[in-house]
Amino acid sequence: MSFVAYEELIKEGDTAILSLGHGSMVAVRVQRGAQTQTRHGVLRHSVDLIGRPFGSKVTCSRGGWVYVLHPTPELWTVNLPHRTQILYSTDIALITMMLELRPGSVVCESGTGSGSVSHAIIRSIAPTGHLHTVEFHQQRADKAREEFQQHRVSQWVTVHTQDVCRSGFGVVHVADAVFLDIPSPWEAVGHAWDALKVEGGRFCSFSPCIEQVQRTCQALAAHGFTELSTLEVLPQVYNVRTVSLPLPDLGADDLEGNVGSDATPFRSGTPMKETVGHTGYLTFATKTPG
């Protein structure tokens, strides 16, 4: 199993995503002899998981069942163990597009955190690209290395343990894109410029506060970045349902005789009353050649 390439059968050591029902999932490490307790009963790894195809519908000990899904960066994002606040797929999708990531791209990232963005970047740049990710916290860096190894993507990522604001990314003039998710991104803008290729590249910074954005944009302009833009992703979910509205009473002028009768049912979409609010601002910029 790899987060980059699909494999048919579940093997020992794989990470599998158990779908327990609508909106309920859990990630498990498949180990021979291990068991996983679910609300549907016990799932025995040796019997119920190993050797079965991903996507199988598996019956648990109490008669309930789960679907065993192949891991993807999107599924990992909603099931990973949180070591820090993370970005979700809505923001990540825009980041990977605006950074123009593709197979073969070299990317510098800080901080690694829980690895949510890292997995999406690796999937975008494999099989010939590479990610240099910087995490100043030793335990988080060690855990990220362990997860990259378990998920069989370690060949596409190097984890650097250092303060990016003081020491940079550990590489110079190799990156096609730089992504920052740190408290003071303006302090790392100079290192981002140095890490990007001489012929240019793309920059992105995630910040929850507009004051951070202002200082980052000032630093970007001072270092020569161009095409500065800041975006906020606010998805609007619609609830689609079948409704039936009675025809209006038009009085004596209603020649059809349909006063008060029901109209033909139709499908209607209305915005959900509760939607996802502000997560953060995404600031993009370009390093131009020369």
From Swiss-Prot:
Binding of substrate, residues: T279
A GO molecular-function annotation: tRNA (adenine(58)-N1)-methyltransferase activity
Keyword DNA repair: no
Complex formation: Heterotetramer; composed of two copies of TRMT6 and two copies of TRMT61A.
Main location, first listed in the record: nucleus
SUPFAM superfamilies membership: S-adenosyl-L-methionine-dependent methyltransferases (SSF53335)
One family name in Pfam for this protein: GCD14
Name listed for the protein in its UniProt record: tRNA (adenine(58)-N(1))-methyltransferase catalytic subunit TRMT61A
A single GO BP: tRNA methylation
Binding site for S-adenosyl-L-methionine: L87, S114, G115, S116, E135, R140, D163, V164, D181
Keyword Methyltransferase: yes
Region (Substrate): 20-22, 35-42, 64-65, 85-89, 110-117, 180-183, 205-212
Annotated family: Belongs to the class I-like SAM-binding methyltransferase superfamily. TRM61 family.
Catalytic activity: adenosine(58) in tRNA + S-adenosyl-L-methionine = N(1)-methyladenosine(58) in tRNA + S-adenosyl-L-homocysteine + H(+); an adenosine in mRNA + S-adenosyl-L-methionine = an N(1)-methyladenosine in mRNA + S-adenosyl-L-homocysteine + H(+)
Subcellular location(s) per record: Nucleus
Root EC class: transferase
EC numbers on record: 2.1.1.220, 2.1.1.-
Cellular component annotations (GO), alphabetically ordered: nucleus; tRNA (m1A) methyltransferase complex
PROSITE patterns documented for this protein: SAM_TRM61
Modified residues (N-acetylserine): S2
Keywords: Acetylation, Methyltransferase, Nucleus, S-adenosyl-L-methionine, Transferase, tRNA processing
Superkingdom of the organism of origin: Eukaryota
InterPro entries the UniProt entry points to: SAM-dependent_MTases_sf, TRM61_C, tRNA_MeTrfase_Gcd14
Role: Catalytic subunit of tRNA (adenine-N(1)-)-methyltransferase, which catalyzes the formation of N(1)-methyladenine at position 58 (m1A58) in initiator methionyl-tRNA. Catalytic subunit of mRNA N(1)-methyltransferase complex, which mediates methylation of adenosine residues at the N(1) position of a small subset of mRNAs: N(1) methylation takes place in tRNA T-loop-like structures of mRNAs and is only present at low stoichiometries.
